């Protein structure tokens, strides 16, 4: 698979704090440790891990996964709000989705992992076209489950070495996976996101969404065309036929008036 995250099972206390290990052999945890060190217990752990590993290898080769069915944020509904850390201009910043309401359209796209293969081709393509999105009063936001430190390291790596170089928009860190989950793109057993893309209007409403599997990159041209069509149809008297681009003939959403369009094609 082009982008795969490995996982390690941790034994921890319910608290997020880390406590120093106790050296006393009378500690209640000793019996638990003895259980783990017994031949039958360790064999069970090994066999369980082997089964998970074999499934992971199969997924890597297939370049495709089956996501769990969550409640997806549907087109026409409000986009789930979030606030998260991000990297922009080689600095750590805060990004809150609702800050764009009433101001800008937002293209929010998810990608699986930093330092992978398909992902940088998409991320840099959106960056190279950022000025065109700015002219359409639109902000671009990229999201993955990586930390801001990973984002920063990737941005500081030049493109010829598989890095991103400087970007013209923020990369958001979703280490808690809460954003990916709320937008219905999280692959639960791998802890990474599918290639989801959402166009959100100035009222904070999702107007367009696409979700690609891991091995398939997205088209900036098609995203741009869709955004232009969405903004054009802000006029309630016009709709856009298939493949419509700015300057081409649109259609009236009326049984009689639409005949003018069909008679001209």
UniProtKB/Swiss-Prot annotation:
The active site is at residue 119. SUPFAM superfamilies: Thioredoxin-like. Residues 1-65 form a transit peptide. One of its GO terms (biological process) is response to oxidative stress. Pfam families: 1-cysPrx_C, AhpC-TSA. Residues 73-232 form the Thioredoxin domain. Gene3D superfamilies: Glutaredoxin (3.40.30.10). Thiol-specific peroxidase that catalyzes the reduction of hydrogen peroxide and organic hydroperoxides to water and alcohols, respectively. Plays a role in cell protection against oxidative stress by detoxifying peroxides. May be an antioxidant enzyme particularly in the developing shoot and photosynthesizing leaf. This is 2-Cys peroxiredoxin BAS1, chloroplastic. The lineage of its organism: Eukaryota, Viridiplantae, Streptophyta, Embryophyta, Tracheophyta.
